[in-house]
Amino acid sequence: MSWKTLDDMDVAGKRVLLRVDINVPVEEGQVTDRTRIDRIIPTLQDILAKGGTPIMLAHFGRPKGKVVPEMSLRVTLPALEAALGRKVTFIEEPNAERLSDLPEGIVVLLENTRFAVGEEANDPEMARFLATLGDVFCNDAFSAAHRAHASTTGVAHLLPSCAGRLMQAELSALEAALSTPQRPVGAVVGGAKVSTKIALLENLVARLDVLVIGGGMANTFLAAQGAKLGASLMEPDYMETARTIMQSAERAGCKLLLPVDGVVAREFKAGADFEVVALGKDTVLAEDQMVLDAGPQSVAAVMAAFRTLKTLIWNGPLGAFEITPFNQATNATALEAARLTKSGALISVAGGGDTVAALNQAGAAADFTYISTAGGAFLEWMEGKTLPGVAALQG
């Protein structure tokens, strides 16, 4: 796949309409996690260094085409200015005339694109309006690339377009992990439900050498083999799907790793009493028992598998990582992946949902090769889908 980057564009003296994702968590009017803001700073600095004027487009929350004051992007200004080290000009009601003669070195943030009813509908009229506000379009919001919206896709077809530095890094990392990986390649797919990751699992078993399944999802796979897992989180309606995925993995030569032991408790709370129980097709738990984490034998098997790999993709935790003592499997395996990455033995790419939080909690995130801040876009890429925001940049 080929796409243009800022290296391919002459932005000197031009207004660069820059789509970013600064949909950050806010409490009591304060940004509580600046990660997404920090990640767009290299693109802003690059545009400024090349003599361009960045005009940021972004969404915030889900106002559904209405002006909702508490979803104004104004709340992000202090964090943006602190990260960038310069003033950012906020414009609530932009128009072409107002943005036609901006002073050199100015950085502009426009109001929430989703206040406009045409944004999520990818309305051609809104796309044409946005195109009047800039000379070049730069998309740095991979995390919104799975949405065909006016500010991600529509405007990209109307202006010379390229990927920003964050988008470029995301695409390069994901292509290296899935499209052209160093083999053997494996993945960890965890989390609560099989139902949300069917397409992902179906796509991965055809591409991987090793697939580790963990979290509540693993319970459904074990139940599909005959295990009786008491009050454990599982999806009986998806047991047949689990069997199909296991058969597909076998046909494709993909080694499927399910837990062989589990941390079992009768209460889902911090510090709950627990025991380690062997897991397999003949396992029978009491009606009030729950599998809440993978056990030590499972952890050892996963870590041994990691040591055979050259590329690892990680999506989802191996247990109820939010609560001690059910975070042990996620923490131990994440730290092993981080160690292997740091030693140069492994390329590791992670993203989606709870994954970033789990790896941060484990203290492993800093040593992974790449961690994607994207949720849905990361998953859809891993499912093999074409992302509209990326497709619009090709050529």
Swiss-Prot record:
It catalyses: (2R)-3-phosphoglycerate + ATP = (2R)-3-phospho-glyceroyl phosphate + ADP. One of its GO terms (cellular component) is cytosol. One of its GO terms (molecular function) is ADP binding. One of its GO terms (biological process) is gluconeogenesis. ATP binds at K197, E322, G352, G353, D354, T355. Substrate binds at D21, I22, N23, R36, H59, F60, G61, R62, R114, R147. Pfam families: PGK. HAMAP family: Phosphoglyc_kinase. Monomer. This is Phosphoglycerate kinase. It comes from Roseobacter denitrificans (strain ATCC 33942 / OCh 114). The gene is pgk.
